Amino acid sequence: MCGILAVLGCIDNSQAKRSRIIELSRRLRHRGPDWSGLHCYEDCYLAHERLAIIDPTSGDQPLYNEDKTVAVTVNGEIYNHKILREKLKSHQFRTGSDCEVIAHLYEEHGEEFIDMLDGMFAFVLLDTRDKSFIAARDAIGITPLYIGWGLDGSVWFASEMKALSDDCEQFMSFPPGHIYSSKQGGLRRWYNPPWYNEQVPSTPYDPLVLRNAFEKAVIKRLMTDVPFGVLLSGGLDSSLVAAVALRHLEKSEAARQWGSQLHTFCIGLQGSPDLKAGREVADYLGTRHHEFQFTVQDGIDAIEEVIYHIETYDVTTIRASTPMFLMSRKIKSLGVKMVLSGEGSDEILGGYLYFHKAPNKKEFHEETCRKIKALHQFDCLRANKSTSAWGVEARVPFLDKEFLNVAMSIDPEWKLIKPDLGRIEKWVLRNAFDDEERPYLPKHILYRQKEQFSDGVGYSWIDGLKDHANKHVSDTMLSNASFVFPDNTPLTKEAYYYRTIFEKFFPKSAARATVPGGPSIACSTAKAVEWDATWSKNLDPSGRAALGVHVAAYEEDKAAAAAKAGSDLVDPLPKNGT
């Protein structure tokens, strides 16, 4: 990941303004410590802080077309850049950067090229021939981007809020899957997949199609000119990422540069579920595994810094971001600049424990759609900013556009959790990789139940955070919360504590509006809380809050179903390879 800042139409091309842009861009340097670039054209500025992953020697930004009339500052990775270059043979490229294709695609197609990009990205492009500009963000919002407006009529774009919040009167999170065009006067959606309107799909489940789509997604993300690894908690998602990456690493260009030994990384409190499971998977796969232990106090000491970098006061996100933030620092110290991570699977496939309560396939599917649309405010934000705080890039194969299209086209009847048929959450994914001849993972790992990252690193982590917040927030403070924080009022002492830290760094109302609110149970949307009347009394975002939906509940449901149906119960669903 890199850091970008663009200021356009600020009616000021003085040296003082240039110095201010450099100062603000410096706030993003943790994202891109390798090099800094600045392009100025009259009263327009494009700044860039580079993390060099592809073509480290010549890919400095901003990037240009042949005559430098088009300039672009990009934060992202374009996985199909070689294919796109083949379609642009009449163009002369200056670098080997994957992102340079953006300038040339604009020359060739105008503004209608964004959907041709396969990757994660946020960019701002300036056409100096008419001083027009566009900005765009990837389909799901893997890559962060904010847009702001100055009193002088200027439009601002930045990878993180901290680079524009002081100088903009109003700002907001740039919506995923959108393009901003100065010519057309605002935002419009470029990403319009079939699932976006939330209509229930009807494609039958084919395990091999799903498996192949995910393998392709992982293979794409092995594109790197620097050392990389995989974040491995030992849960289903990270274990599959590691297993697939290892299976295809030897034939990749990355292996020719860095060898075929895969590095994996895990963090947790002493004796945590993730450390144990991660070690077991690493031993099975034969990876070079790196374990990092932290204490509750280590995490508490980092909370302020985490909130500054993550730019949220959402309880779930902060709980999960803190260990990831600590781990990323350790990873960077080992010389690793890119990691693969397992975000997105739970949203796409209904992996959170509360999906057990979905009343029917329609509501199940609609909830997955809502969760995917909100990913940029939660898991994408965490994965990107926790790692980028230390100059590490996180890639998320489950959010590959093609894999998403395949997974979201499956009739959700196949995704429903049905213990009587042996189907726990994400059964369609588990079954797709249940290969008897060439196993990807041991059975008990392949069918390990979901743990939220903040739970899996050790249950005492969340309890420690609550205890710490209780010491800093009194009953009186919480009772007056609606007066102190009338917008998105915190309902717990932990939420109040995080909010006070956030407001210290980001005091403007526009900043607090970038953080979503509303009731949630075990990471659900507010709508899904309606699925179980008891949840409204226990709105803790931890996975443990979905009481009665853990392993014991599954066993009870299966036993009850077996007793009811007798011994002739047959699972009619397709097995992998049939």
Swiss-Prot record:
GO terms for cellular component: cytosol; plasmodesma. This is Asparagine synthetase [glutamine-hydrolyzing] 2. Residues 2-185 form the Glutamine amidotransferase type-2 domain. GO terms for biological process: ammonium ion metabolic process; hyperosmotic salinity response; L-asparagine biosynthetic process. Pfam families: Asn_synthase, GATase_7. L-glutamine binds at residues 50-54, 75-77, 98. Its EC number is 6.3.5.4. GO terms for molecular function: asparagine synthase (glutamine-hydrolyzing) activity; ATP binding. The record marks 343 as: Important for beta-aspartyl-AMP intermediate formation. Pathway: Amino-acid biosynthesis; L-asparagine biosynthesis. Induction: By light and sucrose. Down-regulated by dark. Essential for nitrogen assimilation, distribution and remobilization within the plant via the phloem. InterPro entries: Asn_synth_AEB (IPR006426), Asn_synthase (IPR001962), Asn_Synthetase (IPR050795), AsnB_N (IPR033738), GATase_2_dom (IPR017932), Ntn_hydrolases_N (IPR029055), Rossmann-like_a/b/a_fold (IPR014729). PANTHER family: ASPARAGINE SYNTHETASE, ASPARAGINE SYNTHETASE [GLUTAMINE-HYDROLYZING]. It comes from Arabidopsis thaliana (Mouse-ear cress). It catalyses: L-aspartate + L-glutamine + ATP + H2O = L-asparagine + L-glutamate + AMP + diphosphate + H(+). Expressed in the vascular region adjacent to leaf mesophyll cells in the companion cell-sieve tube element complex. Residues 210-450 form the Asparagine synthetase domain.
